[in-house]
C-alpha cells in the first residue's frame, strides 16, 4: 500500500510524529518536495529529534529513506543532519538514498533570498531565508545544479562558474551585496561530494521495485497545503507544490499507484510569517493557545500565529488533495478552553461565503462566522483509548467529521509516539482501533 501523508494547513501540523508512528511496517519513506526550511519534530521516549531533509522513517531500523527529485537539497544542511543522527547511533548512510535528479541549494540561493527579503522590508513574504525560492527558480529556468552533477566534477566546475556569474549580477548591481566566489562554492561541493556520493541514485526505479514487491511506502510532505505555490494563499506561500499531486511528480512514482491520502491537521490553526489568516486570535485566547501548544518554529524559532479551526479552508484542502482520512493533532492544547469555536463560513464584504476566495485582498477582508461548542476542561494528554476521552471532546471530533465529510482516523494527544488514538487501521498491520 502506498500512502501520501501531508499537512492541510500552513505547516507545523505534526506530520513527523505521525509518519514516524506509521513506519513500523513500511519499506520506505519518501520526501518529495521542499527543502530544509521546515522541520519535523519527533519525540520518542522523551528524546527530541528534529529532521529537516531526511524523511521521518530514519528512526526505524531498516526503513529506506528517500529524497525525491522534487526536493531542493542543501548539502551542508544534509551533512549536518546526518552527523547529528550518527551521533545518536543511527546509521543514516545505510538507509538514505538521494535522487540523482534532485536540485542542489547553493550559497548564491541563500544570498539572494536574504537580499530580497531585506529589500522588501515591511512587505517581506516572511521566508526562512534559506534559499528555497531561488533554488526552485534555477530549477525551472533549467540552470540548476543537480545531485548527478556531483558525479562529473569537470562539468560541474563550468556549471558553477556560469551560475555564480549570473547570480552575482543581481547580488552586486541590484542588491549591492558582495559577489560570491565560484571556486569556493565548487571546492565546498567537492568536499560534500565524497560524503554523499554513495547515496545518490535512481529513486524512481527503486520505488518501482518496491511497488512490484508489494511493499508499503509512505510519501511524506513538507509544510502544508495552504502554502502550495499554485493553490495556497499566494503570494504568501512556499516555492513548491505542497499538495498530493506533487507526491507523484516529486518522486517519479505514478499517480495511479497511490492508495490513500491522509491529511494532518491541528485541532486549531497556526501560521508562521505574513499572509491572511481569517480565524487568527490576537487576544489572550491566542496567547494561551500558543503557550499551551509551544508554537514556535522547529527550524527558525519564530512564534506562530494561532486561531480557531477553519472548516472552510479545510474543505478546500480536502478537495485539492482528495483526502481519504484526517489525522487530528494537538487536541490536548484545547483542554483548558471553556468554549471551542469552529469557523463554518466567512463573511466577505457583507456576504456570507462557504468557499475561501483565491483573491488575497478579498480573503484578508473576510471575517469568520463561528459555531460555538462547549469545551471539556479536563486533560486528554496521552490518552490512547477513544472511549476514555471526555464526551465534549468526542462531540467536537464528531462535529468536525460531520462538517468535513471525511473520517478522523487518528488522534494525537501528545508529542510522543505513544500519545495516539488509532480509530482506523492505516495499513493492513494489526492495530487495535480504539472506539
UniProtKB/Swiss-Prot annotation:
One of its GO terms (molecular function) is magnesium ion binding. InterPro entries: Adenylosuccin_syn_GTP-bd, Adenylosuccin_syn_Lys_AS, Adenylosuccinate_synth_dom1, Adenylosuccinate_synth_dom2, Adenylosuccinate_synth_dom3, Adenylosuccinate_synthetase, P-loop_NTPase. Its main location: cytoplasm. IMP binds at residues 12-15, 37-40, 128, 142, 223, 238, 302. Gene3D superfamilies: Adenylosuccinate Synthetase, subunit A, domain 1, Adenylosuccinate Synthetase, subunit A, domain 2, Adenylosuccinate Synthetase, subunit A, domain 3. One of its GO terms (biological process) is IMP metabolic process. Its EC number is 6.3.4.4. The active site is at residues 12, 40. GTP binds at residues 11-17, 39-41, 304, 330-332, 412-414. The keyword Ribonucleoprotein does not apply. It catalyses: IMP + L-aspartate + GTP = N(6)-(1,2-dicarboxyethyl)-AMP + GDP + phosphate + 2 H(+). Binds 1 Mg(2+) ion per subunit. Pathway: Purine metabolism; AMP biosynthesis via de novo pathway; AMP from IMP: step 1/2. It is found in: Cytoplasm. Homodimer. Belongs to the adenylosuccinate synthetase family. HAMAP family: Adenylosucc_synth. Plays an important role in the de novo pathway of purine nucleotide biosynthesis. Catalyzes the first committed step in the biosynthesis of AMP from IMP. This is Adenylosuccinate synthetase. It comes from Coxiella burnetii (strain RSA 331 / Henzerling II).
